[in-house]
Amino acid sequence: MLQAAQQLMRRQGIRRLLVLSGEPDWCREQAQRLAATLPGDWPWVGENPPPGLTALPSRAVRQLLGQERLHAVFDAGQSLDVEALAALCGALRAGSWLLLLTPPWRQWPQLPDGDSLRWSDCPQPITTPHFIHHLQQHLADDSEVTIWRQDEPLTLAALPAREGWQPPDGRPTEEQQAILTALLQAESGVWVLTAARGRGKSTLAGMLVAQSPLTCWITGPSRAATEGAGEWAQGRAQFWAPDALLAQCREGDVSEVGWLLVDEAAAIPAPLLQQLIGYFPRVLLTTTVQGYEGTGRGFLLKFCAGLPSYQALSLQQPMRWAQGDALERITDNALLFNELPAWPADGQAIDYSQAEQRELCADPQRLARFYALLSSAHYRTSPLDLRRLMDAPGMHFGLAQAGQEVVGAVWLAEEGGLSAELAHDVWAGRRRPRGNLVAQSLAAHGGQWWAPTLRSRRITRIATLPALRRQGIARQLVERQRSQAQGLDFLSVSFGYTEPLWRFWQSCGFELVRIGSKPEASSGCYTAMAILPLSEQGEALRHAAHKHLARDWPWLRQRIELTLAIPGDDGDTSLGEEDWRELAGFAFAHRPLEASLGALQRLLLASSLPLSALRGHLQRRQSPAACVEQAGVSGQKALLRYWRHETAQALEQLNAQHCRYWRDWAQSLQ
């Protein structure tokens, strides 16, 4: 049955989805039997494939980027990794069947999903009824998806009539040729090519290499991701891993290289990409419009907006399959990959509202618009975000709407409410429970051990429609969250620090309480955290956390490349009770050195002991490697123990009784 349908699918250039819904043994047995009737690659994504089929763990499916397979099985019986599912769909060539194995149809929404451990911040798998109902609805509504339930006969959905498909013949399409002609004539510049999966981005890059008289280098998130370009390049382009390429640019001569081609550029850390671009006269960046490699429109808005100039290019016509492919359609619809058309601002009044998960998920059109707006503003969006939005506990949403259009969106996550005992363990570095990003960070790195006991909501994402930016919509969304909050101590936000972003949060009433010590890999920005107090306890936390940051800032800024003034430091370098607590946490518990930096610097000013290892690193700025050698210890773990030992010595020498008190507190489980 599948074989006859597959011949027509190949002629039409499409792929199809067959859902097998039933008990695990039945699903495996039917999948094995069906695979035996059709020659193909048949990777089995999931655990325990039947004999003769090759297991491919879901975490390894990304390795198929830029590659092609014929037919596949995706076992979603215990765990549904939608990132892996999307990646697998993108790797299947025309004429392929994808078999999706699911639990019994009616039971599925009530069953725990093992994949939820990756995104729900829960210690055990949770049920995910909103997303599963959403997926089931899309599967049932698509006329070309076949759903085969256990104890029912297999009846394939009919294939609509389509014109015959002409697979690529090695020559560029009209779209590709127009872009190639422009690139081959280029003297210099940056070009950004965005397209959906299977549109021939990598093929075009390879054709450029093959036809250009210039030396071309290729980089990408992995060598496998650039295989498509490499095949067309006929061995003329050298592949470099991004970090190795940057090292080569810094240390060697790259003046003979005429083109740098960056495949799936949105998957490469922005600061690294920014530096690479500056070394080459011509750069072609390719990135996927929507999906698991990054969001193309968000990439254009965020990364490319920071370039002096660039030219945007796009490909619309599929290459690996025909226009209107059945598998691409169901994947795009179910995972909300379709970017919504630009909305013309028409002067409609804007209404603000709150929405809880159940309410938002019950309105598919509003959900799609809400998610599309957030995706367009954050190019690191992945299908995990959709799953978290729909089913993770503690999610809350605010919307700004003009008619039916969502023009502003804010997404918040509950944090805090931990017991004092657990909060103390977080402060001491003994435990790091899932979630609670800002609340835990203020305890683990900001010195406020009690912060996780307070109740708060963290703004995880906020976005407004580009046509309506700078009209106060985002600020109004935040104000609505502040005014309608009940039983909360504060709102928080964690963001990559830039002056414009901080000005926005400051205008909303937030105050800085923490700056990370290292730039984020994805953005190159330092993580900043800020809070907006809503209660007396929240105000006390704001005051204490900001004072802690301001007091430590003179030493922190020596390690952080930010031109930022943080008022509030009174210049007092004597050891206070908060310093004793911090130092005891470092000396007698497991707090990291970076979290205790200011207190350690003040300790060195107060102590008359040599403390050679601490002074070498903190006052003379010796590297950890130099400190290891000077201290005669066996490595960085031993060096950390030595630093802790020196700190304990200094505390004991300053005030033995006080030292014992704070040692007992740091080691207690109160």
Tell where the protein language model's regions lie, with residue ranges.
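Conserved coupling/interface region of RecA-like P-loop/ASCE motor cores
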Residues: 125-174, 304-343
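Conserved beta-hairpin
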Residues: 394-412
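Conserved lysine of the Walker
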Residues: 27-28, 201
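N-terminal pre-P-loop "Q-motif" helix
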Residues: 1-5, 167-187
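Conserved acetyl-CoA-binding loop-helix of GNAT-fold acetyltransferases
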Residues: 203-207, 461-484
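Conserved RecA-like ASCE ATPase "motif II neighborhood" in helicase/translocase motors
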Residues: 52-87, 237-278
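N-terminal accessory nucleic-acid engagement/regulatory domains that precede
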Residues: 61-158
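Terminal substrate-recognition subdomain of acyl/acetyltransferases
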Residues: 240-251, 271-272, 278-379, 417-455, ...
